[in-house]
């Protein structure tokens, strides 16, 4: 595994709270999948906040949470009060559950929310290949993706006035740490990366090393197999992010930062 695993999340409660702030945006897919879907598999479910939010709203559906962090899964299971939620620390254990409860994989949708960038930050090359194999070849009817992501053309010179605003209002040492890991913020791609990251001061030693933007929009699209067709696509800036960056630096982010894909199995 990556050396980043030597920098664990120092405050799981704060981490989970941060992740839950975009909860409404994360459930964008629920009105876009057809009624043959009986099971949602939430890959990288953390403490289960997302599916515990959905479970009472859709009592006829099953929500399965997976996270390789066993402490997260323990928290999720301990907090769960819904019979239509189950949690696993192995991504393939749910297949046994499906067979035991007589659900087909073609009745399942895979939700991958804010996970792809973590896979690339914390995994070996082989583990990344295994991840995409799981995504493409398990047989899910839908693959749902939401993550931080920029277009390839975001690599361009940063605006001089934006650089001045950042360097005048943030720790020079922290900026230097970021640039040592990810490159100069004179590249607009890296500047936006920094603006996605700067707020996480409590977990900074972990967060500064994590690559939030390892994959461009175009790259992610290229990783989905030919057996799936694109059903939905959206690329935007989260209003919360735009507002907080404007407040803290008086900078208007001009590139879309969060992408959503829904792919459907052909045939």
Place the predicted regions along the sequence by residue.
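Class I (Rossmann-like) S-adenosyl-L-methionine-dependent methyltransferase catalytic domain
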Residues: 1-55, 66-84, 88-95, 138-267
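A general structural motif
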Residues: 35-37, 60, 104-107, 140
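Conserved S-adenosyl-L-methionine
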Residues: 56-62
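Active-site catalytic pocket residues across diverse enzymes, especially alpha/beta-hydrolases
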Residues: 58, 80, 123
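Short amphipathic alpha-helix with an adjacent loop that forms part of the alpha/beta core around
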Residues: 94-105
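A conserved beta-strand element that flanks and buttresses the S-adenosyl-L-methionine
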Residues: 111
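Hydrophobic adenine-recognition pocket in adenosine-nucleotide-binding enzymes
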Residues: 115
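A short, conserved alpha-helix within the catalytic core of class I
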Residues: 119-135
